[in-house]
Amino acid sequence: MLYKRSSQLFAEAEKVIPGGVNSPVRAFKAVGGTPIFVKSAKGAYLYDEDGNKLIDYINSWGPMVLGHAYQPVVDAVIEKAKLGTSFGMPTELETEIAALAVSMVPNIDKIRFVNSGTEACMSAIRLARGFTKRDKIIKFAGCYHGHSDSFLIQAGSGAVTFGSPNSPGVTEGTAKDTLLAKYNDLENVKTLIEANKGEIAAIIIEAVAGNMGCIPPAEGFLQGLRDLCTANGILLIFDEVMTGFRLARGGVQELYGIDADIVTFGKVIGGGLPVGAFAAREEIMNYLAPLGPVYQAGTLSGNPLAMAAGYAMLKALDNDREIFTRLEEKTAYLEAGIDRVLKANNVVFTINRVGSMISVHFDAGPVTDFKTAAKGDNETFKKFFHGLLQEGVYIAPSAYETWFITDALTYEDLDFTINAIDKVSKTF
């Protein structure tokens, strides 16, 4: 495939945008080459500025559960835009989508909409600190909760892709209030709690990690965190920016039967438009202004276009309960196919999967945390990425990202992908 137009556009972008992109991982620095500039997308496919058609396994980093340009979402946004794009005032639709979300997700009474997953996680931490009157938080190495200062301590996703999981600009004081734990290591968490008794406001976690590849929680790990939080007056925060409304109708709380105290959302809840949200039981949410002392605000929070897109998306997921079964079946089919061809070609690899989230690690594994995820062969991944791109399959340009499956994918698309992986892996 040729990417002449994308190369030209990237050169122009570099003149006026730092690094030529508005989010670092898009720049292809981890894999080399020139980033692909997208012109349009429909269903399971991307169409770039050079006219190439690509099967998409990024899906805007997760929210396109039903595929790109899903018609009910498109129609809802168009109709709402005709009535005005932003008011900075309450609208009826905000209440409707809030009620729908509360009905779908276990253990939440109220929800507050913001503009991104970063903002949702940042606000959730502030709320937890205000509610508990404590300052410290525990996060897990390799988990990514957005680019707020408190979270850029051994973060996953783009931060680790660029080799800088601890960002300059994060003050020493901020860093001291963020305690770092090992994912899937309950004893390590216990040690941190004992060493900081009565000081920890919250533990925040991607219950299924998606920013160091897809890493599932070990058996008993989430329940262990729940028990530790309950015993020590700590709030348990599930970051469901990737998993919410994707792995199950009610997210990971439903999937694993574990209740969080606060849940954060993004991506899916906006149908692809910029939206985030955080939710909890009433006594916690009532600490938010204007009811309580914890301040959080936003001019564009609950804006009508995002609410229209999100409501159409959640309605579709709520009405068709078989979507999650189809996603599971399609992703299991893809997993089996990848496993078969990589083994046949004598590739050293590990596949991790939970529902419609999947990742391929070029290491014998097991891959269970940040340390083991970092052992993957990045040179092999680069060959894998560019080989698939030439075959018309687009995965994330980073070895530390998850693939997201959409209901719009057909089994013919999956077979095409498996055959492409077979062809590419023969060249390793």
Swiss-Prot record:
<keyword id="KW-0413">Isomerase</keyword>
<dbReference type="InterPro" id="IPR015422">
    <property type="entry name" value="PyrdxlP-dep_Trfase_small"/>
</dbReference>
<keyword id="KW-0663">Pyridoxal phosphate</keyword>
<protein>
    <recommendedName>
        <fullName>Glutamate-1-semialdehyde 2,1-aminomutase</fullName>
        <ecNumber>5.4.3.8</ecNumber>
    </recommendedName>
</protein>
<dbReference type="InterPro" id="IPR005814">
    <property type="entry name" value="Aminotrans_3"/>
</dbReference>
<comment type="similarity">
    <text>Belongs to the class-III pyridoxal-phosphate-dependent aminotransferase family. HemL subfamily.</text>
</comment>
<dbReference type="GO" id="GO:0005737">
    <property type="term" value="C:cytoplasm"/>
</dbReference>
<dbReference type="InterPro" id="IPR004639">
    <property type="entry name" value="4pyrrol_synth_GluAld_NH2Trfase"/>
</dbReference>
<comment type="pathway">
    <text>Porphyrin-containing compound metabolism; protoporphyrin-IX biosynthesis; 5-aminolevulinate from L-glutamyl-tRNA(Glu): step 2/2.</text>
</comment>
<dbReference type="InterPro" id="IPR015421">
    <property type="entry name" value="PyrdxlP-dep_Trfase_major"/>
</dbReference>
<dbReference type="GO" id="GO:0042286">
    <property type="term" value="F:glutamate-1-semialdehyde 2,1-aminomutase activity"/>
</dbReference>
<dbReference type="GO" id="GO:0008483">
    <property type="term" value="F:transaminase activity"/>
</dbReference>
<keyword id="KW-0963">Cytoplasm</keyword>
<feature type="modified residue" description="N6-(pyridoxal phosphate)lysine">
    <location>
        <position position="267"/>
    </location>
</feature>
<dbReference type="InterPro" id="IPR015424">
    <property type="entry name" value="PyrdxlP-dep_Trfase"/>
</dbReference>
<keyword id="KW-0627">Porphyrin biosynthesis</keyword>
<dbReference type="GO" id="GO:0006782">
    <property type="term" value="P:protoporphyrinogen IX biosynthetic process"/>
</dbReference>
<comment type="subunit">
    <text>Homodimer.</text>
</comment>
<dbReference type="Pfam" id="PF00202">
    <property type="entry name" value="Aminotran_3"/>
</dbReference>
<dbReference type="InterPro" id="IPR049704">
    <property type="entry name" value="Aminotrans_3_PPA_site"/>
</dbReference>
<dbReference type="GO" id="GO:0030170">
    <property type="term" value="F:pyridoxal phosphate binding"/>
</dbReference>
